[in-house]
Amino acid sequence: MANGANALKVRGFQTVCSDQQRSLIERTPEGLYCRAAKAWVDPWRPVPRALITHAHADHARPGCGEYWAVASSEGVLRQRLGKDITLHPVAYGEEHWLGQCKVSFHSAGHVLGSAQIRLESEGEVWVVSGDYKRDDDPSCEPFEPVRCDVLITEATFGMPIYRWQSGEQVAKDIHAWWSGDRSRPSLLFCYA
């Protein structure tokens, strides 16, 4: 790392910022915290205000005071976290002021209701990608490129050793498996 640079390390990944650039997002024991919004993005522990990138269990955890997420993820979030959670469903691109920060959610193309979270304060724009997918997927809105000064990106399967079949090929394989023996019930497990 160059002299005069600070790094925000997040579970093995880092974002490098110049000394002149303040950190809009910082790592805390609860997760990624935006002090200007008084909110955590996909917190690891219960917090007063959570901004949720999508409804999968590794991003949306129970016990938070309030949740902000894309409206199309509401059903899954309430099923997983409880029907009585305090949830603020938002539309893609809709801007909300939380504290001293303008917050908006933009499609990540990962699953239904998945979002990148854009945070803007004092002329700086940071984006937390959450999980994202750039391939076409009829089950969700396509990935939306979002201009920013700093991008904090998920990279779980970003290494070159991971190569995936196209969604179309996976669908064909599932159909072939299912139609291979129609006399038997078929049960397909998936992660949510």
Region annotations inferred by a language model:
Residues 17-45, 49, 55-191:
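His/Asp/Glu-rich metal-coordinating catalytic cores
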